[in-house]
Design a protein with these regions (language model features):
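Short, small-residue alpha-helix embedded
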Residues: 150, 215-238, 242
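Conserved N-terminal subdomain of the carbohydrate kinase-like
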Residues: 2-109, 113-121, 270-274, 278-281
């Protein structure tokens, strides 16, 4: 039996409302990857649609956790960062990558900071510049079009997009440092939405689209990125991994919509895990 590959996941924890670590940990673990976590904050719920939530910042614990792991000689096959709440946390993750990235370690950064043409209310445009610095350390980044525009210093353009714009954006993002870029929210019309992937080593661009489902579904970016990383760590190409992640995320959304679940609660990723494992070739 081969040893399990190991990923470090650096995200916040929302006790209720499936997103961030409560999505990344089960999905990546189910795909046969051992997951070690550095929690950046603990919240009673995520912040999208809930009020009165509790929040405990864990910035002060992040470096001591990393230092303890370093003293134990722990190594990682992947490092995966998601929502980071401050420039200080970006600095900590940057140092973590410097300390733990080895020749074959895959670094995936989800620059979660903006959507719908706006920065999240807790951030300003300087944060986008700092996130760009972190993305330069990554092998793979998974921005949406708002995050892509802000990292490139451009104005946000809403969908629909042309292939020329999508492919230009992919290549320009790769020039920031990462050799692989997966853009989410790709839509050429109102009927389908998905991702576009670019691998600089092969100059290959690929698309993965699924039928549009009306509504705003919390946590789907975390579901997508977690499935993408899990597939990639299981030996699939970037294009194959993105296609699987789009299909899986779409299934999660459809099940949630059909069940009539409160959309604030997150999507039903659990029932789709067997199909995800079959698609990935794990079972």
């Amino acid at each position: 039996m081969e040893r399990l590959k190991r990923a470090a996941a650096i995200h916040d924890i929302s006790g209720f409302g499936k997103c961030s670590l409560t999505v990344a940990l089960p999905i990546i673990s189910a795909m046969g990857i051992e997951v070690s976590v550095i929690p950046t904050a603990v919240l009673s719920t995520h912040t999208g649609g809930f009020t009165g939530f509790t929040y405990r910042d864990l910035t002060g614990d992040m470096r001591p956790i990393a230092e303890h792991w370093k003293s134990l000689g722990i190594k990682f096959d992947a490092i995966y960062s998601g929502f980071l709440g401050s420039v200080e946390q970006i600095d900590i993750v940057t140092d973590f990558i410097d300390d733990f990235k080895e020749k074959d370690t895959v670094v995936l950064v989800d620059p979660a900071m903006a959507d719908g043409g706006k920065m999240y209310t807790v951030f300003d445009m300087d944060f986008a510049k700092q996130m760009t610095r972190l993305c330069a350390k990554a092998d793979i980044i998974v921005p949406n079009f708002t995050e892509a525009a802000f990292m490139l210093g451009e104005e946000y353009r809403p969908a629909p997009y042309s292939k020329e714009y999508v492919e230009s954006t992919l290549r320009r993002l790769s020039c920031l440092g990462p050799s692989k870029v997966v853009l989410t929210g790709v839509a050429f019309d109102g009927r389908q939405v998905g991702s576009a992937s670019y691998d600089r080593s092969t100059d290959e661009i690929s698309y993965a689209l699924s039928d549009t489902v009306d509504g705003y579904f919390h946590g789907t970016g975390d579901v997508f990125a977690s499935a993408l990383l899990g597939a990639y760590m299981n030996g699939l190409s970037l294009a194959e991994s993105a296609s699987i992640a789009v299909d899986y995320t779409h299934g999660c959304i459809v099940r949630t919509k059909e069940a009539g679940t409160d959309l604030r609660y997150g999507v039903d990723f659990e029932h789709g895990i067997p199909d995800l494992l079959r698609q990935t070739g794990i079972i």
